[in-house]
Amino acid sequence: VGKGVDITAEFAVTQDHQGAPGLAHGGLLSLAFDEALGKLMWLLRAPAVTARLEIDFLKPVPIGTKLYITARITGKVSRKVYSEAEGRLGGPDGEVVVRAASLFVIVPMNHFLENAPADYLEELRKNPDVLRFVDPEFEINP
């Protein structure tokens, strides 16, 4: 977790993430950024969904490197949360090779539970504090 409403993550780029020979697949990098930006919602304790995700691939990301992703919230208007991120090679202060911008929309917790598998719901019933971390008012079958 970063200093304010921001986070820093390390993404190890392995052979499993390869697209073109020796390089990370852009779709998998997009996934990593969506996850990092989505984790910002935990800092707000607000369940949310990705409404928009824009990625700028500035330089190739080689297999065997570590991508340092820093994400921050840049604004909030009602249920809309705006955020940005960048990915750097060579360390947290290294060269920026990927940039992202996103819009998340805060939704009720039930949005996630309506299609959840039965075993997932059962696990939540056993451990309700998992959801209370995000939404302190939420209860399963109150």
Show which residues each predicted segment covers.
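A generic structural signal for short beta-strands and their flanking turns/coil linkers
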Residues: 3-9, 27, 49-53, 67, ...
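HotDog/MaoC-like acyl-thioester-processing domains
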Residues: 61-63, 74-142
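A short, contiguous structural element within a folded domain that forms the immediate neighborhood
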Residues: 16-26, 31-43
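Preference for short coil/turn "hinge" residues that link or interrupt alpha-helices
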Residues: 16-17, 50, 54, 90
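Hydrophobic beta-strand-centered segment that forms part of the acyl-chain substrate-binding groove
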Residues: 35-74
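Charged, low-complexity, helix/coiled-coil-prone segments
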Residues: 8-14, 27-29, 109-111, 115-117
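Residue-level recognition of well-ordered beta-strand positions that form the cores
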Residues: 10-12, 54-56, 70-72, 86-88, ...
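Catalytic strand-loop segment that frames the active site of acyl-thioester-processing enzymes
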Residues: 1-24, 138-142
